[in-house]
């Protein structure tokens, strides 16, 4: 009787494992298919945060704009602020990732290693919570795949159009209009730097009313963007 019970339990376990693998395969297929769907420039993706705002009837402001209609200094500032190796890595910055692992093994506080590509796939396909560290593991292969399929220019275009720049404010056109009352094409170097340093915490930081700390960060990014050179060459 005990042997029969163990056999039933094993069959039940195998059945659940098979179901879990099927679910995992389906979940992996969704971002794969969407990545190819998002290749054409006339397709305007939305982020999971936008979908959440729609589901909760919060509403949001997002006005898709071609990267050709964004002041180049904005993309340059974002690269120099968020991901200096954007034009050189393949979706994941292995040097930064290695540093995070070394810090974690040493018991030290870890620094961020999320690339613009990783942030893009997170915003498109994943929820920030409650996945936590599991989400980070999923981000890595997704970012590598996304980078292999998309051009750097298209990745940046999607990123700039789905990034959050304040409560209910998504994309650079809505951000430029909301914070400075101008289209993204007319952003100055200073405004671009302020918007770039807002990205890590868009709810708490206000580029239109920066505090001393945000102004110092913007000064640094403005200088770096002015000397970005080859670091932004993939967008040309």
UniProtKB/Swiss-Prot annotation:
What coarse category fits the chief subcellular location reported for this protein?
A: membrane
Write down any Gene Ontology CC term.
peptidoglycan-based cell wall
Subcellular localization is given as: Cell inner membrane
UniProt superkingdom? Bacteria
Question: What chemistry does it catalyse, as a reaction equation?
Answer: [GlcNAc-(1->4)-Mur2Ac(oyl-L-Ala-gamma-D-Glu-L-Lys-D-Ala-D-Ala)](n)-di-trans,octa-cis-undecaprenyl diphosphate + beta-D-GlcNAc-(1->4)-Mur2Ac(oyl-L-Ala-gamma-D-Glu-L-Lys-D-Ala-D-Ala)-di-trans,octa-cis-undecaprenyl diphosphate = [GlcNAc-(1->4)-Mur2Ac(oyl-L-Ala-gamma-D-Glu-L-Lys-D-Ala-D-Ala)](n+1)-di-trans,octa-cis-undecaprenyl diphosphate + di-trans,octa-cis-undecaprenyl diphosphate + H(+)
Q: One MF term from GO for this chain?
A: peptidoglycan glycosyltransferase activity
Topological category with respect to the lipid bilayer: Single-pass membrane protein
- Enzyme Commission designation: 2.4.99.28
Task: Give the record's GO biological process terms.
Answer: cell wall organization; peptidoglycan biosynthetic process; regulation of cell shape
Enumerate the UniProt keywords alphabetically.
Cell inner membrane, Cell membrane, Cell shape, Cell wall biogenesis/degradation, Glycosyltransferase, Membrane, Peptidoglycan synthesis, Transferase, Transmembrane, Transmembrane helix
- Pathway(s) per entry: Cell wall biogenesis; peptidoglycan biosynthesis
Q: Which family does it belong to?
A: Belongs to the glycosyltransferase 51 family.
Q: What is this protein called?
A: Biosynthetic peptidoglycan transglycosylase
Classification from the root reads:
Bacteria, Pseudomonadati, Pseudomonadota, Alphaproteobacteria, Hyphomicrobiales
